[in-house]
UniProtKB/Swiss-Prot annotation:
Catalytic activity as recorded in UniProt: 2 fonsecin B + NADPH + O2 + H(+) = aurasperone B + NADP(+) + 2 H2O; 2 rubrofusarin B + NADPH + O2 + H(+) = aurasperone A + NADP(+) + 2 H2O
Lineage start: Eukaryota, Fungi, Dikarya, Ascomycota, Pezizomycotina
Record's keyword terms, sorted: Heme, Iron, Metal-binding, Monooxygenase, Oxidoreductase
SUPFAM superfamilies xrefs: Cytochrome P450 (SSF48264)
Pathway in which the depicted protein is active: Secondary metabolite biosynthesis
InterPro entries, per the entry: Cyt_P450, Cyt_P450_E_grp-I, Cyt_P450_sf, Cytochrome_P450_monoxygenase
Similarity comment: family membership: Belongs to the cytochrome P450 family.
Gene Ontology biological process terms in this record: biosynthetic process
Residues the entry annotates as binding heme: 134
Protein name: Cytochrome P450 monooxygenase aunB
Length: 159
């Protein structure tokens, strides 16, 4: 999961050099040395977190969901789903659905920090939600923040 997400994130950053430049500028303001790039500081960087969230949305490492049983009947998109039926969500399709995202196929980290954005952020569930949420969620975010920030701080990337 981690290597796929790092590959995807740097792929999108390199395909969108303006995003990489903005991220480099944000990370460079955190500290004078690479050792100062702690997760406590990095967690407060809006653009770094937006890049990570946008990568989770547009290229989810885990596409399937955990099957859950419908507790009571419900009509979804005109189709009745009776009680007891197992359902799951396809994360890739959800992350690319124009019903939830403006320009869903465009890598746009700004959508995560723009207060006027019309996207439905509840449609991005890279770690699931509720009782079945991944227990390693916070650790994964910490690892991605530190790894991405240190790579961007130490190296120059280009295509």
């Amino acid at each position: 999961t981690a290597d796929n997400m790092l590959n995807a994130l740097f792929y999108f950053l390199l395909r969108n050099p303006q995003c990489l430049k903005r991220l480099e500028e944000e990370v460079s303001c955190v500290g004078a040395t690479v050792n100062e790039l702690s997760d406590d500081r990095l967690a407060k960087l809006p653009y770094l977190n937006a890049c990570i969230n946008e990568t989770f949305r547009i290229a989810p490492a885990f596409n399937g969901g955990i099957l859950q049983r419908v507790s009571c009947g419900a009509t979804v998109d005109g189709v009745y789903v009776p009680p007891g039926v197992a359902v799951s969500v396809d994360h890739y399709t959800l992350g690319h659905d124009p019903q939830y995202w403006v320009k869903p196929d465009v890598f746009n980290p700004e959508r995560w920090i723009d207060p006027d954005c019309k996207d439905n952020f509840k449609a991005s569930r890279p770690f699931l939600i509720g009782a079945r949420q991944c227990p390693g969620r916070q650790m994964a975010y910490q690892m991605f923040r530190v790894c991405v920030a240190k790579l961007v701080y130490l190296y120059t990337f280009e295509l």
